[in-house]
Amino acid sequence: MARVCKVTGKRPMSGNNVSHANNKTKRRFLPNLQSRRFWVESENRWVRLRVSNAALRTIDKVGIDVVLADLRARGEA
């Protein structure tokens, strides 16, 4: 399963670990993904999404119906 948020599209990015001696080694910054179930009142069912914490805030703000409509418009749900 890819580490990609279904709503925001956030995915891992690369960067460096930097030691006190300023040595640099490559690392990955992973998105804060959560598997959550959302109750969709209009469809009277649960929807399971793997979303980032930022997407959870978006869903709280605009509502799950708006987010699902956007996903369906993009052809992802």
UniProtKB/Swiss-Prot annotation:
Entry's Gene Ontology molecular function annotations: structural constituent of ribosome
Pfam family, one: Ribosomal_L28
Classification via SUPFAM superfamilies: L28p-like
Family note: Belongs to the bacterial ribosomal protein bL28 family.
UniProt keyword annotation of Cytoplasm present: no
InterPro entries: Ribosomal_bL28, Ribosomal_bL28/bL31-like_sf, Ribosomal_bL28_bact-type, Ribosomal_bL28_sf
Gene3D superfamilies with a match to the protein in the record: Ribosomal protein L28/L24 (2.30.170.40)
Protein name: Large ribosomal subunit protein bL28
Region feature Disordered, mapped onto this chain: 1-26
Coiled coil: none
Ligase among keywords: no
Organism: Neisseria meningitidis serogroup B (strain ATCC BAA-335 / MC58)
Alphabetized HAMAP family for the sequence: Ribosomal_bL28 (MF_00373)
Listed GO biological process terms: translation
GO cellular component, one term: cytosolic large ribosomal subunit
Name of the coding gene: rpmB
Keywords associated with the record: Ribonucleoprotein, Ribosomal protein
